[in-house]
Amino acid sequence: MADTTTPPRSDGFSAEERAAMKERAAELRAEGKKGAKKADGLQAVLDSIAKMAPEDRALAERVHVTVTATAPELLPKTWYGMPAYANADGKVVVFFQDSGKFGYRYSTLGFQDTANLEDGDMWPVAYALMRWSDAVEKQVVELVKAAVS
């Protein structure tokens, strides 16, 4: 007798990508319940950072402190399970992706299209981040200031 079961279809997403999409769906459900409060977003970011590997956690903590001090108008929230900082419209401006999220050898500081980083016809929107230093902090401050300008 012929096999009538349908073989599993590959959707092209890795397990990590599917997990991130599930995290985002949960975030959207939580935001829809009585509206997300700034305190809820902050706690979600802190919880996200706490779950990271020690090296990533140290970077994420520095990014968090630097972004919130540089642009206090940005609201902390999680975005696909990652620490992110959104404008008053709730649109993510800047986010931190830890190296463990998708198995990369570096963490990423990324900016969405709401960030004002335009510089000619081409400009970077993501930065590999391996270690924190005074020079890195200065560059992050400059990028965040430009992003919210």
Which residues does each predicted region cover?
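Charge-dense, helix-prone N-terminal extensions
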Residues: 1-149
